[in-house]
């Protein structure tokens, strides 16, 4: 059987971090090799931010947001109003932006936050 669309409901729920990582790596390989669409239902926003290339946010039974992870997670205040969790790194970088750190947008991964902060530090002039 070679389905065009694979629908998974909380595929990593209850798994240890290593096994969860292996599951998501396997799903990425399946998506790339077979060119499948994978619909992932999850409440774990870090997984969604890392795995998805498109995110739909459901709120009160309707699609409230639709976009790339970067687009969706940059709408921090709206997500918080809907009581939707965001990745911890997104929350941290959003807080930095509110404090005046000139990040382009909230980051969705630690690696992305590192790159953004390194770029800012590179642009800083020595005292």
Regions found by a protein language model. Give the residues of each.
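Catalytic Walker B motif of ABC-type/P-loop ATPase nucleotide-binding domains
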Residues: 6-9
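ABC ATPase "signature
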Residues: 66-67
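A short, surface-exposed alpha-helical micro-motif characterized by mixed small hydrophobic
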Residues: 48-50
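A short, proline-enriched helix->beta-strand linker immediately N-terminal to the Walker B motif
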Residues: 1-4
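ABC ATPase nucleotide-binding domains
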Residues: 80-127
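H-loop/switch region of ABC-family ATPase nucleotide-binding domains
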Residues: 42-43
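Helix N-cap at the start of a conserved alpha-helix in ABC-type nucleotide-binding domains
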Residues: 17-19
């Amino acid at each position: 059987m070679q389905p065009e669309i694979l629908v998974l409901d909380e595929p990593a729920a209850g798994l240890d971090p290593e096994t969860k990582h292996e599951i998501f790596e396997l799903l990425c390989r399946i998506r790339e090799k077979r060119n499948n669409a994978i619909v992932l239902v999850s409440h774990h926003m870090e997984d969604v931010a890392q795995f998805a290339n498109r995110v739909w946010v459901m709120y009160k039974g309707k699609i409230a947001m639709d976009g790339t992870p970067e687009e969706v997670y940059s709408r921090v205040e709206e997500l918080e109003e809907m009581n939707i969790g965001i990745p911890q790194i997104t929350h941290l970088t959003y807080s930095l932006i509110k404090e005046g750190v000139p990040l382009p947008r909230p980051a969705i991964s630690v690696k992305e936050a590192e790159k953004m902060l390194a770029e800012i530090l590179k642009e800083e002039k020595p005292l």
